[in-house]
Amino acid sequence: MGLALGIQEFGRLEKRKAGEGHANVHFSSATDEWETPQRLFDELSWIFGGFTLDPCATRANAKCIRFFTKADDGLAQRWEGKVFVNPPYGRDIPLWVRKAYEESLKGALVVCLLPARTDTRWWWDYARRGQVWFLRGRLKFGKARNSAPFPSAIVIFGRYFSV
């Protein structure tokens, strides 16, 4: 089994059931935080040999021992090592994707979970410069009952192995 197949298999497990609705928050601007599904994080951590930093965390959902919260301002910090990024999906997402790309140029390996918004400027300016793995189906973020109303992708910036 190839590593990319493992990602696709995860996507199959998270497929949305026909007729399921979405929580109202998914269609509102009530939040731009989408908590990473633990199983997806665990699989990515295994593929990349563990992550050393989560720069877009809350104390409650941090995925790494070293993490930055909103108060720490992850955009203003240096990212080193193997970094996992699931940024807020609001208006600042272009800043996070640019930061991920720029930190990879300084030596970090940055693995991002992003909405697959291929029609956006930030996707064309930065996301497409990484290796892109589109996830099959739609993810269930955090404790949501239903799948997200958008597809997702893993974007990898930096020196890494090819799968």
Regions found by a protein language model. Give the residues of each.
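Class I S-adenosyl-L-methionine-dependent methyltransferase catalytic core
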Residues: 2-163
